[in-house]
Amino acid sequence: MKETNKWSVRDVITTVLLSAVLIVIQLVVNMVCMANDFVSMVLSVGITMFLCAPVYMLMVSRIGKRFVTLIYMTILGVIFLLMGNWFLLPYYVLVGILCEAILWKEGSCQKPKRLTAAWTVASLLYNGVNLLPIWFFWDTYYDFVLASGMEQSYIDSYVRYYTSPGWLAFILLFTTLMGFLGCMVGSRLIRRHFKKAGVL
């Protein structure tokens, strides 16, 4: 789809709907992974970024305009705000701005390499959802976790994984790699299916 700067009502609706799909995927994966502390703390973000990558690439390619990623990240931040994690709203807005900078050059929304770069960076920075609380907003996060009914064992696991340099390095590398691999799958789906079907 040709990239233009003029937004239509259809573009806005499509962006919001696909952003909602991305957020639902993230929430579902998070809920399923909560059954095991290791999977929840170490693997869940990577799994999320892998599964969301094709949808993200489809959304940005389909709309073909600037600020799609920023809108999605802002909506995501608002969801976290409503859940009580207010500090994640400005954080994800900043992540969205960084991704927009990667995609700013005209025609970038149609280039798999640019989309892959943007989502890979987003995948790395998505870990802020777990890192910011322990680094800067522990009291706010601790109150949120207790109010959500989490057990102390969950909190202890969280602290253990995210204060260990080895585990932290693994989590960051795993999440970034999974986001990248998800984009490889997304690129293939777009090339082999969506373009042939006339979606793009």
Language-model features: locations:
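Membrane-interface helix-boundary motifs at transmembrane edges
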Residues: 3-7, 62-64, 103-113, 193
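Short helix-perturbing small/polar motifs within transmembrane alpha-helices
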Residues: 24, 92-131, 183
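Interfacial aromatic-anchored transmembrane helix boundaries in multi-pass membrane proteins
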Residues: 30-35, 75-103
